[in-house]
Amino acid sequence: MRRHLLPVVSLLVLLLLVRQLYPYVSGSDPSIVDGYEVNLVSENLGGPTCLVWANDTHLLVCDRDGGRITELNIETDARRTLLDGLHHPHGLLLHEGKAIVSEQGQLSSYLIAEDGLFVDGQTLVSGIPAGNHQTNSVNVMPNGTLIWHSGSTCNVCDEADERNAALLWVNATTGEHGVLASGVRNSFDGVWVEDHGYFFTDNGRDWEGDHPPEELNFLIADAAYGWPDDEPETPVPEGSEAPVGRWTPHTSMNGVDLRPVHSSLPGLSPSEGFTLYTAVYGSWNTLLPKGHE
């Protein structure tokens, strides 16, 4: 019996080895749509987790690893630190003359000085637990209320703090806040689309094969979005909202933005609708590893 099992075990080991080597032997050159090209704008920026335009030439970058916000001149590659001493910054919003900064477990508001530095910080919200994930992007609704994306502390569990695995609303002045949507395992970002509403990404559980797909969701206030009850047999649990878009499981659909009407990038015309672009991180937890998309 053992002799018969040996070829099977050997084959499984070989397949496992091929899977691990696949990212190295499959090549790292990006596949690009005809008529477009990929250019290096800058490098050595630490662990970039957000990109926000300050103006036509200056790009603000959240450096998760360095704990800072960096200003980058894309024409000269000159850079300077606008704010440091942060704990894993993941989000930045420029709003009404202030910089709203999301870091691990905390949301703060800073005045923007004449020289562009972020000063006189005021903590809006603190004490959000972190674990497998943390608090991510911060955006603003048309009425001025902030939307803060808060990840789960685990892969699959019942959270002790309802502010985890949720979208939170936050008053930009007082810091008053609450849960806007629940059952959102790890939503990294969202975008407001005029005449439609707020669309947001959400990344599902790991270590369960190619299940579940990553999600693009449409925000309905006070709605639940399924986690942690979204089993393979019940991908959309009763009483929860289904996604409006899906992507490869475990690849982390993170940043999302609206394609400008006059953009040269592929997309729908205004008469046809609108187009969203997302940044996909990639994963080795898929059946075949996937790179950035």
Predicted regions and their residues:
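Asp-box/WD-like beta-propeller blade repeats and closely related beta-sheet repeat scaffolds
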Residues: 105-141, 149-152
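Residue position within the beta-strands of beta-propeller blades
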Residues: 60-62, 101-102, 147-149, 199-202, ...
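A short beta-strand motif characteristic of beta-propeller blades
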Residues: 38-43, 78-84, 122-128, 176-181, ...
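Short loop/turn segments that connect beta-strands within beta-propeller blades
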Residues: 72-77, 112-116, 171-175, 219-222
